[in-house]
């Protein structure tokens, strides 16, 4: 039995996430967690809400709530939606937890001891009207390059030119619109990533099985231009983790907090501490997952994220762990995803364009979405959600292939043999051929799942469903029954056992449907089919079952058109 630690990129606290966010991290991480649990491995699957930074403060202000209250409320909302989507976290934590405060301050102290933190004076824009320093992207003005009037202080979205806030013509606060801005000097702490460039380079080179997408992004940041730059790890904000060296104050850093991208990945570790506390466990129970001197040396650690998060997870977070000089578990495999686009454009939170997780569950159960998203995961390139493709995939794969097989075999058995597994008949050449095909395909399915090849895994699972349909079509027990009821009984018994096999293999993708199949079959035998022939005899003659309700309803053209119009844009923020 292996021990597998899985983390998913933390969803930001300011609002409900769309399906593009879901498929880029949490959903494939859940797929991998469920698969490994199904294989009998010990899994720790952690995630949390990312709660610090300017956007959280602004979202709270817009909602008219104290930021701590807003974050607590939105954490509960996101946790509930995650649960309803079947995301099987062992713990869903919060980056604002006491554990993350203590651990972030601990790491900062260790990095300072190692000489990897330096203090830098820099000039930043201060808004007198807002009473705060403004991050670059909260300053708007006219682009000096192309004249676009809503360029941000870090980049013009129109011409893509990189900018500094002082480059903008007629700059104003994006929060209040005020032009009462001034440049003030402020001091911040920087993590000396440049001093660790060679160490990080060697570490990334050792990861020979990482996706090209992941390593190419990391290498670009390491070597392009002037190479890996030092990174500011503090901010002038009220909400966040106070800057300290462990338990001690940090002179000159009073009133400042750690930058959200410094503390957020540390929450992966802190979430394990939260898990231990929530379950009445000891520090040793979570440290065996994260400290290689306390039992984590045999752990396989896998991270899931969108490609925009790769630089922080391949460079900044490893720099924090390696730089601390302590024996923390480093990531073994980093699975990154491209973007999911929406119906000819992009998902847009601000414009309400696309389907958000809460809305998705209002119109269809989670399994419909899980299947489409995972079978179309944006792995080697960006992929696109269209309503036509969604309808086609649900209707063909889920309703026609899997659902139809379950319905046909259970209803036929009920009509000819009653609601129990029939006795009689032996396997012949057709059955042996099916067993050989399934053995080959399940082996391929396992290899794809272990390699985290999400789309290929879904394709192989669908082919396994198709094999059962093709067997049923060629065996034709409804015809055989007229001449040889015994042989038909053997075919039906195999078909009913195929349903159990499908429930086991499909559980990581469509867990609710899988549970319904187990319930209909009256079994909790979820054992993995190491031996396909034995798996197809798991339900013995005389075992009672019930015919399940329709497993997946087809999506009508009218529904598709209605939803396409509804989610074209205009969601109220």
UniProtKB/Swiss-Prot annotation:
Superkingdom, taxonomy of origin: Bacteria
Cofactor: binding details: Binds 1 zinc ion per subunit.
Short sequence motif 'KMSKS' region: positions: 346-350
Needed cofactors: Zn(2+)
Pfam families: Anticodon_3 (PF19303), tRNA-synt_1g (PF09334)
Gene3D superfamilies registered for this protein in UniProt: HUPs, Isoleucyl-tRNA Synthetase, Domain 1, Methionyl-tRNA synthetase, Zn-domain
Catalytic reaction list: tRNA(Met) + L-methionine + ATP = L-methionyl-tRNA(Met) + AMP + diphosphate
Residue ranges annotated as motif 'HIGH' region: 11-21
Molecular-function annotations in GO: ATP binding; metal ion binding; methionine-tRNA ligase activity
GO BP annotations, alphabetical order: methionyl-tRNA aminoacylation
Major site of localization recorded for this protein: cytoplasm
Compartmental location: Cytoplasm
Cross-referenced HAMAP family: Met_tRNA_synth_type1 (MF_00098)
UniProt subunit comment: Monomer.
Listed name of the protein: Methionine--tRNA ligase
Species per Swiss-Prot/TrEMBL record: Ruegeria sp. (strain TM1040)
């Amino acid at each position: 039995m292996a021990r597998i630690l899985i983390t998913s990129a933390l969803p930001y606290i300011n609002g409900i996430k769309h399906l593009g966010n879901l498929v880029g991290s949490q959903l494939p991480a859940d797929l991998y967690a469920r698969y490994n649990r199904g294989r009998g491995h010990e899994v720790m699957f952690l995630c949390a809400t990312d709660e610090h930074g300017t956007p959280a403060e602004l979202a709270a202000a817009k909602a008219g709530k104290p930021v701590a209250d807003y974050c607590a409320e939105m954490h509960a909302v996101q946790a509930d939606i995650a649960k309803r989507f079947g995301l099987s976290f062992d713990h869903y934590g919060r980056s604002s937890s006491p554990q993350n405060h203590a651990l972030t301050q601990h790491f900062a102290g260790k990095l300072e001891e190692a000489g990897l933190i330096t203090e830098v004076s820099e000039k930043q824009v201060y808004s007198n009207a807002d009473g705060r320093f403004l991050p670059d992207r909260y300053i708007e003005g006219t682009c000096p390059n192309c004249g676009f009037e809503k360029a941000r202080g870090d980049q013009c979205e129109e011409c893509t030119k990189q900018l500094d806030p002082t480059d903008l013509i007629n700059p104003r606060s994006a929060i209040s619109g005020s032009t009462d801005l001034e440049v003030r000097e402020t001091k911040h702490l920087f993590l000396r990533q440049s001093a660790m460039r060679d160490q990080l380079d060697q570490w990334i080179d050792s990861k020979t099985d990482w996706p090209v997408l992941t390593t190419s992004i990391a290498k670009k940041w390491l070597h392009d231009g002037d190479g890996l730059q030092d990174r500011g790890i503090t901010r002038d904000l009220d909400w966040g983790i106070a800057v300290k060296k462990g338990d001690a104050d940090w002179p000159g850093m009073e009133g400042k907090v750690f930058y959200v991208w410094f503390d957020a990945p540390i929450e992966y570790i802190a979430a394990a501490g939260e898990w231990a506390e929530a379950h009445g466990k000891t520090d040793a129970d979570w440290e065996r997952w994260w400290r290689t001197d306390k039992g984590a040396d045999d752990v396989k650690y896998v991270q899931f994220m969108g490609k925009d998060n790769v630089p922080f997870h391949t460079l900044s977070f490893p720099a924090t762990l390696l730089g601390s000089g302590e024996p923390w578990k480093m990531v073994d495999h980093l699975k990154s995803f491209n973007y999911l686009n929406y119906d000819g454009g992009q998902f847009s939170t601000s414009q309400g364009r696309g389907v958000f997780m809460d809305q998705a569950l209002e119109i269809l159960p989670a399994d419909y979405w899980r299947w489409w998203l995972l079978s179309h995961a944006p792995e080697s390139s960006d992929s696109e959600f269209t309503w036509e493709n969604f309808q086609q995939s649900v209707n063909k794969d889920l309703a026609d292939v899997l659902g139809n097989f379950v319905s046909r075999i259970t209803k036929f058995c009920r009509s000819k043999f009653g609601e129990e597994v029939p006795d009689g008949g032996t396997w012949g050449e057709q059955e042996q051929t099916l067993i050989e095909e399934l053995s080959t395909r399940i082996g391929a399915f396992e290899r794809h799942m272990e390699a985290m090849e999400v789309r290929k895994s879904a394709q192989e699972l669908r082919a396994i469903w198709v094999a059962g349909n093709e067997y049923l079509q060629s065996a034709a027990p409804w015809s055989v029954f007229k001449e040889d009821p015994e042989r038909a009984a053997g075919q039906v018994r195999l078909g009913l056992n195929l349903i159990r096999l499908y429930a086991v293999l499909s559980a990581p993708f469509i867990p609710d449907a899988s549970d319904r199949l187990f319930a209909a079959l009256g079994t909790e035998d979820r054992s993995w089919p190491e031996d396909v022939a034995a798996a197809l005899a798991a339900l013995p003659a005389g075992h009672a079952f019930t015919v399940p309700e329709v497993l997946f309803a087809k999506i009508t053209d009218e529904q598709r058109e209605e939803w396409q119009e509804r989610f074209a844009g205009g969601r109220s923020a």
